[in-house]
Amino acid sequence: MSPRHLLVLGLLLAPLASAQAQDPAPKEYRVLLVGNSLTYTNNLPALLRAVGASQGTTITTETYAAPGGKLDDRVDEGHVSAALLARKFDAIVLQEQGGHLAACMASVQEQRKAPCAASVKAYGTLSGIASAQGAKVLLFGTWGPDDRWQGKLDRSVRMLAKKHESRVFDAAGALEALRKAQPDIKLYPDGTHPSTLASVMLALALYRDVTGIAPIAKDLRVTAPLLPVNAAVSPASAMESQTGLAGDGKTTVIPANLVEPLVKALPEPKDEDEDAEQRGSRGR
């Protein structure tokens, strides 16, 4: 082939090579979620799977949760540790009980109390096993009732992330960004638990944190029920295997036109130290 033909061929192939470099091949991700009603309300794991499917990326979830559950409860039961040792996960999401426990690291007095010590130990146990198995550890940063309390929650989860060499899944930050974009939206209908759209926002943000790729607004097809706050969730087995929670073949479609404003509202990823300095507190 002549040099001229080689040059023309190279020019034709260059855009294709560039597109391939920018568009990595979809991968399958396995995600382990541990938490309570903030995790299972509206079925965050199922929403995460739906976001993945909409992007051409298979996400498999395994979830251990219970109403009002604490991380040390899940450690004591042993199911989460056993799952980490038996199966390969790309990421684990740890969501602690809200209120004083989630914010306890921000207070020297609370740190000295047994519940806080047990929580910190549970974080360490699970993040240690997960990291040793090569999984990314994400600490679920929850939301509070006012600016002052939100500041405590933010400081606490970042202290834990630094202590255990983990990363923060800034759920509160994602929902605050949505509130700023849509001031009239009701994020917490009962004052605590996320609305359906709020949970979709969390799923979009979590997808980005797990995969490192920003989602594109597309129809979401959710193949498991959007669970209520009082769902009969048992921590004795993975939520995805429990009768009534795994789905009955029905699909809920969340159209792309509802997803698009949420994708646009996603906050830009920040360095965690920079984020902590710029955002000392957040309220609803």
What kind of feature is each model-predicted range?
Residues 1-7:
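Bacterial N-terminal signal peptides that target proteins for export
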Residues 128-137, 166:
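A short helix->loop->beta-strand "cap" motif at the edges of active sites that frequently abuts
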Residues 45-48, 123, 127, 154, ...:
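Extracytoplasmic/secreted envelope proteins and their assembly/folding machinery
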Residues 28-32, 38-113, 117-118:
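Conserved SGNH/GDSL esterase-like catalytic core that processes O-acyl groups on lipids
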Residues 19-21:
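Boundary at the C-terminal end of the N-terminal hydrophobic targeting segment
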Residues 8-15:
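Bacterial N-terminal signal peptides
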